[in-house]
Regions:
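Ankyrin repeat boundary/linker residues
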Residues: 35-36, 69-70, 109-110, 133, ...
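N-terminal segments that cap or nucleate solenoid repeat domains
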Residues: 1-51
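Ankyrin repeat domain, specifically the short helix-to-loop turn at the C-terminus of the second helix
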Residues: 21-29, 57-65, 91-104, 131-139, ...
């Protein structure tokens, strides 16, 4: 990735006397699709550092970056959810509504089988959990490769507010047995 573009994403710099994001991304069709050695796009970098205005501008110019995955198959939504950047999550979800990709993005899994909700629960970011569940309350949020559902992760870690939110808001939460055939109820009791 162009170091100037990376630095701008890291700092959330949409434009100053030396740099203008729109000009930089529009100058070359490939600019928006440049990646870091880990496969992160400029949108991933903005999500990592919590720059919602920068993310919004990137998506206006290159909306296809919304569903791009890095080398760990993470989208920018996975990264923002993991870091607890609520405003970035809001921007990404708003863009999904504009481009009719809501279900696709919220249901995408990374290399471990985690959705963005798995990441938000594991990192204990309640505001992000609420946004994600509200955005796609019809989804069952199946287990990841370790057999953990978001409901199981919330129960196992004692993240009671997330547990309650998932149970109250998610129309069909997955109660499947997790690791060692323990259900979310087992995990809550053991915790």
């Amino acid at each position: 990735m162009d170091p100037i573009l990376y630095s701008a994403a890291m700092r959330g710099n949409i434009g100053d006397y030396n740099f203008l994001l729109a000009d930089h991304l529009k100058r070359d069709e490939e600019n928006g699709y440049q990646v870091t050695p880990k496969g992160n796009t400029v949108l991933h970098v903005a999500a990592l550092y919590g720059h919602s205005d920068f993310a919004r501008e990137v998506l206006k110019i290159t909306p296809a970056l919304l569903c791009c995955q890095n080398k760990k198959n993470e989208t920018a939504l996975h990264i923002a959810a993991n870091e607890g950047h609520t405003e970035v999550v809001r921007v990404l979800l708003a863009c999904t509504r504009d481009h009719n990709t809501k279900e696709k993005l919220t249901r995408m899994t990374d290399a471990s089988g985690d959705t963005a909700l798995h990441k938000a629960v594991r990192s204990q970011h309640l505001d992000v959990v609420k946004l994600l569940v509200e955005e796609d309350s019809e989804f069952e949020y199946p287990p990841n490769h370790a057999q953990e559902t978001p409901l199981y992760l919330a129960a196992e870690s004692g993240f009671h507010d997330a547990l309650i939110n998932i149970l109250e808001s998610c129309k069909k939460p997955t109660y499947a047995a997790g690791p060692s055939n323990r259900t979310p109820l087992h995990a809550a009791v053991i915790q």
